[in-house]
């Protein structure tokens, strides 16, 4: 069955390519892998781009029907994401999203004023949705889980912009991706605006056959099990 993209996903990918947040070529990743594409959400750096980015996150969240009280953005990349998506949910999500709160952590605890490492909403006895850009080794979300657990909050899900759909390690017999690993470990859904298969579908006719072939080969080599 062919993969269908919704309008918000198409718009997200169009803008990602336009602002070069999504680029194609040959890129060395932290993992040491040579990737035929590179994704940098930090290039969504204007008011217009951020508004559209927030809309994409918000629609993905609304469609998931996930019940939560607080959006938590791990420092640093998650901080602006939590804020803009909280605002966008209030704008387009209807009455049940009007009072969604947001919070983030400091990298270093503050020992004066209000103190602590949590800024924004208190997390105790709250249902928490963690927001971030991508998930690779899952390190950031593991740290976020610890912070939220220490604050007596309950993580009910996570959302990222792009699911790369590749195995964390080629030695993993289960062949799980970072998102699948986190979902299995913590028993939560990991949502995304788009995944690599959406990118491949969207790019049909927009890139050369050679570029498309390289992405498909990369997915065949490093792709996670379904």
Curated annotation (Swiss-Prot):
It is an enzyme of class 2 (transferase). One of its GO terms (cellular component) is cytoplasm. One of its GO terms (molecular function) is orotate phosphoribosyltransferase activity. Pathway: Pyrimidine metabolism; UMP biosynthesis via de novo pathway; UMP from orotate: step 1/2. It catalyses: orotidine 5'-phosphate + diphosphate = orotate + 5-phospho-alpha-D-ribose 1-diphosphate. GO terms for biological process: 'de novo' pyrimidine nucleobase biosynthetic process; 'de novo' UMP biosynthetic process; pyrimidine nucleotide biosynthetic process; pyrimidine ribonucleoside biosynthetic process. It comes from the Eukaryota. Pfam families: Pribosyltran (PF00156). 5-phospho-alpha-D-ribose 1-diphosphate binds at residues 30, 76-77, 106-107, 110, 112, 132-140. PANTHER family: OROTATE PHOSPHORIBOSYLTRANSFERASE 1-RELATED. There are two genes coding for OPRT in yeast. Present with 39300 molecules/cell in log phase SD medium. This is Orotate phosphoribosyltransferase 1. It comes from Saccharomyces cerevisiae (strain ATCC 204508 / S288c) (Baker's yeast). The lineage of its organism: Eukaryota, Fungi, Dikarya, Ascomycota, Saccharomycotina.
């Amino acid at each position: 069955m062919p993969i269908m993209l919704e309008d918000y996903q198409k718009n997200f990918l169009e803008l990602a390519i336009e602002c070069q947040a999504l680029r194609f070529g040959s890129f060395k990743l932290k993992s040491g892998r040579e990737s035929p594409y590179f994704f940098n959400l930090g290039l969504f750096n204007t008011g217009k781009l951020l508004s559209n980015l927030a809309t994409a996150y918000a629609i993905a969240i609304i469609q998931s029907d996930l019940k939560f009280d607080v959006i938590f953005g791990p420092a640093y990349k998650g901080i602006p994401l939590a804020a803009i998506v909280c605002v966008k949910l209030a704008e387009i999500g209807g009455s049940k999203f009007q009072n969604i709160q947001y919070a983030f952590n400091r990298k270093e605890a503050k020992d004066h004023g209000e103190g602590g490492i949590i800024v924004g909403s208190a997390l105790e006895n709250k249902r928490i949705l963690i927001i971030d850009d991508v998930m690779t080794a899952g390190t950031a979300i593991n740290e976020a889980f610890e912070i939220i657990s220490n604050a007596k909050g309950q993580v009910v899900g996570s959302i990222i912009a792009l699911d790369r759909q590749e195995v964390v390690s080629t030695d993993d017999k289960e062949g799980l991706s970072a998102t699948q690993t986190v979902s299995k470990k913590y028993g939560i859904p990991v949502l995304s605006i788009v995944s690599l298969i959406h990118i491949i579908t969207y790019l049909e006719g927009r890139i050369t056959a050679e570029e498309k072939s390289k992405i498909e080969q990369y997915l065949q080599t490093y792709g996670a099990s379904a």
